[in-house]
């Protein structure tokens, strides 16, 4: 029998060593024990996979940019090599996302009770995020499918958060931040993105007195990010004469 506490300890250790693949593997094992995760365990899982997928997303963006430049040069051999390397990174990224999505569907979301609103929103947001990461690299019909799955998860999380969580709750704010990025970057819908971000920011400002001391730092940081995005997006729209964002 695997010792749960040992696995969690290993994940903490791996995080300190910045060995995020090891951290993710340990937290995957914890999740597969099929018992609800504590808040700390939930955060360890999230941080681990965010770093694992983040490295691939970053590599993919760099290689995609090189691929565009190489295509302009017309060097066939180099174009083929760059394309093959991009596809290799894509496969890795997709495997990480599918790993997380299967943990969410088979254990984490499934095991949330009706009243565990915070966990449910946390995991549905995560589901929206990982389908969004798939959408960043997908094309055609495949892209349409993952975009729809991302929208569905974000939308469900958004409804639950509005009904059951304070506007200043960091998980509710973090969801609004990522959902608005989804509208802006994936759906190419800057107006919806701005509306969602502005509403979340304004609702939180109106209830600043409900800010929990423990989450004060987290909440205010996310509010700042919402405001930064709004500033950027509205200036983009003005630059484009009210057109679409350039991401």
Curated annotation (Swiss-Prot):
It holds the Pfam family 14-3-3. Changing residue 133 to S: Found in an individual with neurodevelopmental disorder; likely pathogenic. The modification N-acetylmethionine is found at residue 1. The modification N-acetylvaline is found at residue 2. It is found in: Cytoplasm, Cytosol; Mitochondrion matrix. Keywords: Acetylation, Cytoplasm, Disease variant, Epilepsy, Mitochondrion, Phosphoprotein. GO terms for biological process: cellular response to glucose starvation; cellular response to insulin stimulus; negative regulation of protein kinase activity; negative regulation of TORC1 signaling; positive regulation of cell-cell adhesion; positive regulation of T cell activation; positive regulation of T cell mediated immune response to tumor cell; protein localization. Residues 2-247 are annotated as: Interaction with SPATA18/MIEAP. The keyword Mitochondrion applies. Phosphorylated by various PKC isozymes. Adapter protein implicated in the regulation of a large spectrum of both general and specialized signaling pathways. Binds to a large number of partners, usually by recognition of a phosphoserine or phosphothreonine motif. Binding generally results in the modulation of the activity of the binding partner. Promotes inactivation of WDR24 component of the GATOR2 complex by binding to phosphorylated WDR24. Participates in the positive regulation of NMDA glutamate receptor activity by promoting the L-glutamate secretion through interaction with BEST1. This is 14-3-3 protein gamma.
């Amino acid at each position: 029998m695997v010792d749960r506490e040992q696995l969690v300890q290993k994940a903490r250790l791996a995080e300190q060593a910045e060995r995020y693949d090891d951290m993710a593997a340990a937290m995957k094992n914890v999740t597969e024990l099929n018992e609800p995760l504590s808040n700390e365990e939930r955060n360890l899982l999230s941080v681990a996979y965010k770093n694992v997928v983040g490295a691939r997303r970053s590599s993919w963006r760099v290689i995609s940019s090189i691929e565009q430049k190489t295509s302009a040069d017309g060097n066939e051999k180099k174009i083929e090599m760059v394309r093959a390397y991009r596809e290799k990174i894509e496969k890795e990224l997709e495997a990480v996302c599918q790993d997380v999505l299967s943990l969410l569907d088979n254990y984490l979301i499934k095991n949330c009770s009706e009243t565990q609103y915070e966990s449910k929103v946390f995991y549905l947001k995560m589901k929206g995020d990982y389908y969004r990461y798939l959408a960043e690299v997908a094309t055609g019909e495949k892209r349409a499918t993952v975009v729809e799955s991302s929208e569905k998860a974000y939308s469900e999380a958004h409804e639950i958060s509005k009904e059951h969580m304070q506007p200043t709750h960091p998980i509710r704010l973090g969801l609004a931040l990522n959902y608005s990025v989804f509208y802006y970057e994936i759906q190419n819908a800057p107006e919806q993105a701005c509306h969602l971000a502005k509403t979340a920011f304004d609702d939180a400002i109106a209830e600043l007195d409900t800010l929990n001391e423990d989450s004060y730092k987290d909440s205010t940081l996310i509010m700042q990010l919402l405001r930064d995005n709004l500033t950027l997006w509205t200036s983009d729209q003005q630059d484009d004469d009210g057109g679409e964002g350039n991401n």
